[in-house]
Amino acid sequence: MYAEYVNQLKNFRIRETQGYNSWCAGYTMSALLNATYNTNRYNAESVMRYLHPNLRGHDFQFTGLTSNEMLRFGRSQGRNTQYLNRMTSYNEVDQLTTNNQGIAVLGKRVESSDGIHAGHAMAVAGNAKVNNGQKVILIWNPWDNGLMTQDAHSNIIPVSNGDHYEWYASIYGY
């Protein structure tokens, strides 16, 4: 793939991937805050422990987060996180990335609304123009060791296990 333009969060790195748990939002926020603060002090487990200090064992392993908890955590870390009831546009991603503001993707699985991964959070690492001007958004799925490119005109995200997620909302400002 030929990239004629790439705009990525300068310090975005994949430091950990999601195992058998429901912590996708923790992984997403950790990656975004580590990037925008240029640190490595955040990790998914500590984020989840901060938000659910009294859960233990199976209950802790399989707790997820609400969008309000994600907003609250971002704000507790000095960020003015905001909820957007839709996918962010290519131009919004470009501007937020340029301004070193991370974006979380909130997705609903298209195939089934049941099970451990019915809802899923992913991180926007930036945006690019590839293959003669096709606009794409660079997304990190916490299950994966690399970034994927998402057509900027589609809110349906195919992921590595074969499922598809509808990008129904965003939280930006991490």
Curated annotation (Swiss-Prot):
Keywords recorded for this protein, A-Z: Cell wall, Hydrolase, Protease, Secreted, Thiol protease, Virulence, Zymogen
Pfam (any one): Peptidase_C47
Entry's EC annotation: 3.4.22.-
GO terms under biological process: proteolysis
Localization per record: Secreted, Cell wall; Secreted
Activity at various pH: Optimum pH is 7.0 for elastin hydrolysis.
Active site per UniProt: 24, 120, 141
Reported modifications of this chain: Proteolytically cleaved.
One GO MF term attached to the UniProt entry: cysteine-type peptidase activity
Record text on activity regulation: Also inhibited by chloromethylketones TPCK and TLCK and by human plasma inhibitor alpha-2-macroglobulin. Stimulated by L-cysteine.
Domain of life, source organism: Bacteria
Entry's induction text: Expression occurs in a growth-phase-dependent manner with optimal expression at post-exponential phase.
Cellular component terms (Gene Ontology): extracellular region
Similarity comment: Belongs to the peptidase C47 family.
Function: Cysteine protease able to cleave elastin, insulin, myoglobin, fibronectin, fibrinogen, HMW-kininogen, alpha-1-protease inhibitor and alpha-1-antitrypsin. Along with other extracellular proteases may contribute to the colonization and infection of human tissues.
Name of this protein: Extracellular cysteine protease
Gene from which the chain derives: ecpA
